[in-house]
């Protein structure tokens, strides 16, 4: 994108072409399987001269890359956090499996606080009741009381969980990493919201479209004027069904093409 930004700053008409298009266009020009830098340059130049409907890349599109970078960065961070949460579930199953039936979900602040301070059934069983009850009450903002702390401790005393210091240390470190990711994701989302407020897109007026999903859709699609029908947007996202027909043979079990942006597919599925 450095070269792209440089060309735009110089006011030069700049075009961005889908590599899939150039590859198919190159194959249509010759039956030979020749691919060199010289051939690629000739193919791109030929496409630019023959495609009268090709639109130049605008400065607005370039700055849209900032939003794309943020939404993709957030996507990767959330995916990383999800893997860590899976690790939490695995470690709890080893150290104190009974707690899963005592709370709505493991992945809440009060449970993380408890497991970070007492990373295992043995530690909870040996904890002083006053300290334990104060911790769960503060971490849950009053939702959990002394009775809850007693329930946790009694369950820990008869737990089948293993006493493994190495796993307890891993659990503490994993919780710490999740907290760090939570803070990073929140910071990224704040930056996304700032850009979305500046754009003021009507996409947010659609029921069910949040800042996060709306931002991802806008970032991946860019300029909606490039698409004159919903079908083209679906094709761009790789959500169109693949089609095979030859003579009287017509495939009846079409699969999604899954070409294009996987981030856009995710956003459209989850919007």
What are these regions (language model features)?
Residues 1-271:
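A detector of single, family-specific signature residues
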